[in-house]
Amino acid sequence: MNGAVPMLAIDGPSGAGKGTVAGLLARRLGWNLLDSGALYRLLAFAAVNHGVDLTNEEALKVLAAHLDVQFVAADGSHGQRIILEGEEVTDVIRTEQVGAGASQVAALPAVRDALLQRQRAFREAPGLVADGRDMGTVVFPDAPLKIFLTASAEERARRRYLQLKAKGADVDQSALLEEIRERDERDSQRAVAPLKPADDAILLDSTEMSIEAVVETIIRHCERQGWDV
């Protein structure tokens, strides 16, 4: 790990707004962006496309090591376009089905190990904003600033419902709430890199906060680090 490069680690459960907040912060700071969840979504998506069973740990490990993926800076809520094997999959990998698959493969030790160095390679000058579920605990334990961003399951389901409805999807909010609760349990109970705040993380509950308020709150913490914002 390149500890000389400043970085901000943002962890939290599904639907807490990590991706949107991280993208906005990366643009504000002029730093690189790592959406670690996208890597697991990409792996799950690629596995299905290549006929690899999501329980086949060895095959998934090989696939993870050879993912042909590019992250291209762009406007929008996630701050980047994602290209897999030459095709843009930015929106395709954001479905609930792919998310469930990502949570499944993320529980496999060999998969997490295969993607670990790939994630750490994103830490380059002038800095990095990384979001995920184990950024501050496993991937970048030396990050000088760690945020654990959360919100109530009900609020996260509401946000996801509005997001999907805006895209024209036919979704049921109660079903989304159940999926979020199931994923929370799966992510927090897995044996490897379970979802939990780092001991030195700042806890931030965004249930009653706007995205803008969350960003400004984190920016104030960045200023305390002496970073140029």
Curated annotation (Swiss-Prot):
Keywords: ATP-binding, Cytoplasm, Kinase, Nucleotide-binding, Transferase. GO terms for cellular component: cytosol. InterPro entries: Cytidylate_kin, Cytidylate_kinase_dom, P-loop_NTPase. One of its GO terms (molecular function) is (d)CMP kinase activity. Pfam families: Cytidylate_kin. Its EC number is 2.7.4.25. It catalyses: CMP + ATP = CDP + ADP; dCMP + ATP = dCDP + ADP. Gene3D superfamilies: P-loop containing nucleotide triphosphate hydrolases. It is found in: Cytoplasm. It is an enzyme of class 2 (transferase). HAMAP family: Cytidyl_kinase_type1 (MF_00238). This is Cytidylate kinase. It comes from Pseudomonas aeruginosa (strain ATCC 15692 / DSM 22644 / CIP 104116 / JCM 14847 / LMG 12228 / 1C / PRS 101 / PAO1).
